[in-house]
């Protein structure tokens, strides 16, 4: 799990009002993705978890593309802090 000051700031900025923001959702999806990835390293044939992982990856990718279109600076900060690769534009 990623625990650093940036993520704690996102979680604590506006506790209840902030849950709908794209940044909060991206951070929570990233935590779920990392948890599922470590689970799948142990259980390689858990196909339902693999499907869930692919769905969460797609949701996070859509949110990241939305954030890059609306706020490029915040997008760059977020992918830098979470160690996520920048997506290729198609």
Swiss-Prot record:
MF annotations from Gene Ontology: structural constituent of ribosome
GO biological process terms, semicolon-separated: translation
Source domain of life: Eukaryota
Chief subcellular location: plastid
Keyword Plastid among record annotations: yes
Keywords for this protein: Chloroplast, Plastid, Ribonucleoprotein, Ribosomal protein
Keyword check for Disulfide bond: no
UniProt subcellular location: Plastid, Chloroplast
A cellular component annotation (GO) from this entry: chloroplast
Disulfide bonds: none
SMART domains according to UniProt: Ribosomal_S15
NCBIfam families found in the cross-reference section: S15_bact
Complex and partners: Part of the 30S ribosomal subunit.
Family: Belongs to the universal ribosomal protein uS15 family.
Protein name, UniProt field: Small ribosomal subunit protein uS15c
UniProt organism field: Gossypium hirsutum
Taxonomic classification: Eukaryota, Viridiplantae, Streptophyta, Embryophyta, Tracheophyta
Gene that this sequence comes from: rps15
């Amino acid at each position: 799990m990623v625990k650093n000051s940036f993520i704690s700031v996102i979680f604590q900025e506006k506790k209840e009002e902030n849950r709908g923001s794209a940044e909060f959702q991206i951070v929570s999806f990233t935590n779920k993705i990392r948890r599922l990835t470590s689970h799948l390293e142990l259980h390689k044939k858990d196909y339902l978890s693999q499907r869930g992982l692919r769905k969460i990856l797609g949701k996070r990718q859509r949110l990241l593309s939305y954030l890059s279109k609306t706020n490029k600076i915040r997008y760059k900060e977020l992918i830098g802090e979470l160690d996520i690769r920048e997506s290729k534009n198609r």
